[in-house]
């Protein structure tokens, strides 16, 4: 019996009672699943093999259809009819993209109406509020909206387009995509989604993925730093004075907590920053007040699908295995916040506000402009309390 099954065959199998299983990691699954699939990692799949005996069989998929072959073979050894989806999730995504080509203009209009109406309160309003609260835009700005291809940056681009229609500020936009070494398949996904959403992207290429591929320690951190430098450089070349990144509210509170738990420090992800290496350039984060669950709901309501990271570390099905340290720590922090929220519904807001209500007089030490200040430095200079 053939171990791989084609996309054209799975619909009939599912109608006949087969179970569709997504064996990718949690982070990948957050970016989208094949409708009707059940998330189940490799180890859990084998431990719970017995429950599939009540079904005619199972169809398993991973990112590219490589690791799922081994999983299907393991289940077959337990006498459970199992297939691996040829090409995995990426093959399904390519097929879906092809089906959407003829409906591009209609879908774009629906998505834009949704931002103006259904999603105005949860997406556009907090976007506009962040821009105003943190004074992110001035007349004459030319902003490089940096698009990675994920849900956050794509939504940010649409919200900027909507904000520009309001004409409260006179600013220009460049929708900038850096190709750091994407596979042709992943680049097609980014280009397709940009076309579907009506985002006129400007793509430039770099060799960042090749540069960090051999780095064992913190490749994601180094990649992110290099990417930002390339984005600043290209944005300035295009006449921009600001770059916009798609970090949202949940990124902010997770960063605050991760700094304390894993870094032994208190720091926040700032809503805007002056560049230290590119004079006159600024970084802004206009998604600062938008919740990730609302972004996911927007994505799912509009049947949009995005790749996770699209880098070479996940491109060869490694996303079927455990994530790198940075992703795993962020996922742990995300789960911790969700657990704390069960007993305290204000936990997220309290974490966010904690960096707005810092009492320096109660801090043992703090750093400002690279200089460390200790409470003992001024302790004896202060007026002593006499009871």
Where is each model-derived feature located?
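Rhodanese-like catalytic fold shared by cysteine-dependent sulfurtransferases
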Residues: 1-19, 25-57, 63-116, 192
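Short, structured coil segments at secondary-structure junctions
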Residues: 33-35, 78, 197-198, 279, ...
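A structural preference for short, hydrophobic beta-strand core positions in alpha/beta folds
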Residues: 39, 84, 175, 203-205, ...
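ATP-dependent adenylation/nucleotidyltransferase module used to activate substrates
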Residues: 102-258, 262-266, 270, 293-294, ...
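Catalytic subdomain that performs nucleotidyl-dependent activation
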Residues: 172-173, 251-332, 336-337
């Amino acid at each position: 019996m053939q171990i791989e099954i084609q996309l054209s065959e799975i619909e009939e199998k599912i109608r006949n009672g087969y179970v569709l299983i997504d064996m990718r990691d949690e982070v990948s699954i957050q970016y989208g699943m094949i409708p009707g699939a059940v998330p189940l990692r490799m180890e859990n799949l084998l431990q719970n093999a017995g429950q599939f005996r009540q079904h005619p069989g199972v169809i398993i998929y991973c990112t590219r259809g490589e690791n799922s072959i081994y999983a299907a073979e393991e289940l077959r050894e337990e006498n459970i009819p199992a297939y691996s989806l040829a090409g995995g999730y990426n093959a399904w995504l390519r097929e879906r993209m092809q089906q959407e080509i003829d409906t591009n203009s209609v879908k774009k209009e629906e998505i834009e109406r949704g931002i103006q109406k259904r999603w105005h309160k949860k997406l556009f309003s907090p976007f506009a509020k962040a821009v105003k609260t943190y004074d992110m835009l001035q007349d004459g700005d030319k902003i490089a909206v940096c698009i990675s291809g994920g849900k956050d940056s794509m939504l940010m681009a649409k919200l900027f387009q909507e904000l520009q229609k309001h004409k409260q500020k006179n600013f220009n936009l460049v929708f900038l995509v850096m190709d750091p070494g994407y596979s042709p398949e992943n680049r097609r996904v980014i280009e397709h989604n940009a076309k579907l959403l009506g985002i006129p992207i400007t793509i430039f290429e770099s060799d960042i993925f090749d540069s960090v591929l051999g780095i064992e320690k913190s490749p994601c951190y180094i990649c992110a730093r290099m990417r930002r430098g390339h984005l600043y450089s290209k944005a300035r070349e295009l006449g921009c004075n600001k770059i916009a990144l798609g970090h949202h509210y949940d990124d902010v509170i997770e960063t605050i907590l991760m700094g304390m738990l894993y870094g032994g420090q208190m720091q926040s992800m700032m809503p805007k920053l002056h560049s230290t290496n590119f004079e006159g350039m600024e970084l802004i984060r206009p998604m600062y007040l938008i919740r990730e669950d609302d972004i996911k709901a927007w994505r799912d309501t509009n049947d949009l699908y995005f790749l996770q990271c699209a880098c070479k570390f996940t491109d060869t099905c490694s996303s079927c295995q455990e994530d790198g340290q940075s992703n795993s720590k962020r996922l742990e922090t995300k789960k911790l916040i969700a657990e704390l929220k069960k007993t305290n519904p204000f936990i997220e807001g309290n974490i966010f506000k904690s960096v707005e209500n810092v009492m320096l007089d109660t801090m043992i030490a703090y750093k400002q402009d690279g200089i460390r200040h200790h409470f003992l430095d001024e302790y004896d200079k202060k007026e002593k309390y006499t009871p």
